[in-house]
A protein has these predicted regions:
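Conserved, single-site charged/polar hotspot
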Residues: 2-228
């Protein structure tokens, strides 16, 4: 894979209206050629006392196109014998994760309760292009899942006193975006392999599979998204 220029997708705005419900407008929706884009819309019913209004959602750019901070390097296998550390006894595929929508220390950032599969689909749709070959999509999605399950298994943030599973900051974790458009081929692959992860011989925990784009940021020893 090579970096695409110019912009490899079009952007659209979708407005959804229904009587008795608050309207929703989603802007900056990515649409790629020959790939079905899926946009979830959740509408809130209006109370009698409420006036009609519109919820505005702006989808951030894909990390391959936008400007985001690079990942701060960490050990791919976390120590699990430290006194007082919280760690699960076995690898568990969670039904839900709690996503902190910002850096760990940002107390103003909102926390979202997200189904694990939906979280992976969101991150993959935020981090890679849906037009890439199937084998490339699978490799990247597997890395995303292993990273996520390492955070779950080690209870990384809860062990530091936080009440969430993972953040949406690319400096610490992976990009997750509220209202993100999901792509049908990415959704299908996640449904097929959602309980898979990478590990090392004699290592029980999923490894923290860190990666970078390989163009704007280089990362020796990590997977690069361009060229994967």
């Amino acid at each position: 894979q090579e970096p695409d220029r110019p912009q490899p997708f079009s952007e659209y705005t979708v407005t959804v209206q229904a009587e008795g419900y608050r309207s929703v407008e989603v802007s900056a929706i990515d649409v790629f050629a020959n790939v079905t884009a899926l946009q979830e819309i959740r509408m809130e019913p209006l109370d009698i006392s409420q006036k009609e209004g519109t919820e505005n959602i702006v989808v951030p750019p894909n990390t391959l196109w936008g400007d985001f901070p690079p990942k701060i390097p960490e050990d791919e296998v976390k120590p699990v014998n430290e006194s007082g550390e919280i760690v699960l006894s076995r690898v568990v595929i969670p039904e839900y994760v709690i996503v902190h929508d910002g850096p760990p220390t940002d107390t103003r950032a909102q926390d979202y309760y997200v189904r694990y599969r939906d979280y992976i689909k969101n991150v993959a749709s935020s981090e890679i292009y849906s037009t890439w070959p199937e084998a490339t999509l699978r490799a990247n999605i597997l890395a995303i899942m292993s990273f996520s399950l390492n955070r779950v298994y080690t209870e990384w943030y809860r062990g530091k006193g936080y009440d969430f599973t993972i953040t949406s900051s690319t400096a610490y974790d992976q990009k997750w975006s509220f209202g993100r458009t999901i792509f049908s081929n990415i959704s299908r692959i996640v449904d097929e392999i959602f309980n898979h992860y990478l590990s090392r011989p004699k290592v029980q925990q999923p490894i923290l599979t860190q990666y970078c784009d390989g163009k704007n940021v280089t990362c020796s020893g990590w997977m690069t998204q361009w060229g994967s």
